[in-house]
From Swiss-Prot:
SMART domains: PDZ (SM00228)
Domain PDZ: 133-213
Tissue specificity of this protein: Widely expressed.
Subcellular location as annotated: Cytoplasm; Membrane
Listed Basic residues bias regions: 1-11
Protein name per UniProt: PDZ domain-containing protein GIPC1
Molecular-function GO terms, alphabetical: actin binding; GTPase activator activity; identical protein binding; myosin binding; signaling receptor binding
Record gene name: Gipc1
Family of this protein: Belongs to the GIPC family.
Membrane topology: Peripheral membrane protein
Region of interest: Disordered: 1-53, 223-244
This protein's record includes keyword Signal: no
Length: 333
């Protein structure tokens, strides 16, 4: 963003007396540049103008989920930068931020901040709380865990299947960050790597999970939830547009996804959980984006290998993704 004279004075990062869910009708994409007149224009001759939407000037309101004043954050293009801005506003180490939810302070995995933020969304940051170590006997092949990650190096539990091995261990809850398995640190690992490690643990053996739960306010200390059913709540922002965060490249302001895209993303996310034990709406959205204009499964497989080769998706999974996108296109929900 260009700097210049005559800009409005920047608001302080913390706003003590603001309501928790304020109206922000003044949010917009960018501001007029401070330079004007022919002299300024002549001095810039020959230089290409900066891309207008490279870093859209959007201000979001945020609180710590366990309770805090309201903060204002702006100027981030990915999740890692977002966590840094939140940490700066609340004078915390960035490593303390575990994940964020949109428009609720509760550990609600259906409101988890992923790759998109509605322009009117209110961000609640969940920070590290109590650490715990739990021994688990793997009596069945499937533990009943669905893993996701925050895009910044922390993998955590998004869902616990009812009646599963993990469901019977009350110390383990949705929202717990998985720090280590049998002493092996998982900090910096992606969700699919953690899910694979859990799957490869031998049946009939005991293993140790080192976990960190989100810090809780008094009104949040209650019986743990197994997480909502996929698609049981709004997955994307409710504002007039959405800020799309990418792990590579700049953030962009986009229209809300179409009904086809929203349903396709939901179906692909379900397939990720079924095949790989993870949920990741940003990954699902990327796969839908790659596949919506492809003519056959082979073209989709080629696009996925080129962009997402690290995941090594099996052929049957790619075929099911192709089918899910096709079903959503023709309205077979």
């Amino acid at each position: 963003m260009p700097l210049g004279l005559g800009r409005r004075k920047k608001a302080p990062p913390l706003v003590e007396n603001e309501e928790a869910e304020p109206s922000r009708s003044g949010l917009g994409v960018g501001e007029p540049g401070p330079l004007g007149g022919s002299a300024a224009g002549e001095s810039q001759m020959g230089l290409p103008p900066p891309p207008a939407a490279l870093r859209p000037r959007l201000v979001f309101h945020t609180q710590l989920a366990h309770g805090s004043p309201t903060g204002r954050i702006e100027g981030f293009t990915n999740v890692k930068e977002l966590y840094g801005k939140i940490a700066e506003a609340f004078r915390l180490p960035a490593a303390e931020v575990m994940f964020c939810t949109l428009n609720t302070h509760k550990v609600d995995m259906d409101k988890l901040l992923g790759g998109q933020i509605g322009l009117e969304d209110f961000i609640f940051a969940h920070v590290k709380g109590q650490r715990k170590e739990v021994e688990v006997f793997k009596s069945e092949e499937a533990l009943g865990l669905t893993i996701t990650d925050n895009g910044a190096g922390y993998a955590f539990i998004k869902r616990i299947k009812e009646g599963s091995v993990i469901d019977h261990i009350q110390l383990i809850s949705v929202g717990d960050m998985i720090e280590a398995i049998n002493g092996q640190s998982l900090l910096g690992c992606r969700h699919y790597e953690v899910a694979r490690l859990l799957k490869e643990l031998p049946r009939g053996r005991t293993f140790t999970l080192k976990l960190t739960e989100p810090r809780k306010a008094f009104d949040m200390i209650s019986q743990r939830s197994a997480g909502g059913h996929p698609g049981s709540g709004p997955q994307l922002g409710t504002g007039r547009g959405t800020l799309r965060l990418r792990s590579r490249g700049p953030a962009t302001v986009e229209d809300l996804p179409s009904a086809f895209e929203e349903k396709a993303i939901e179906k692909v996310d379900d397939l990720l959980e079924s095949y790989m034990g993870i949920r990741d709406t940003e990954l699902a959205a990327t796969m839908v984006e790659l596949g919506k204009d492809k003519r056959n499964p082979d073209e989709l497989a080629e696009a996925l290998d080129e962009r997402l080769g690290d995941f090594a998706f099996p052929d049957e999974f790619v075929f099911d993704v192709w089918g899910a996108i096709g079903d959503a296109k023709v309205g077979r929900y």
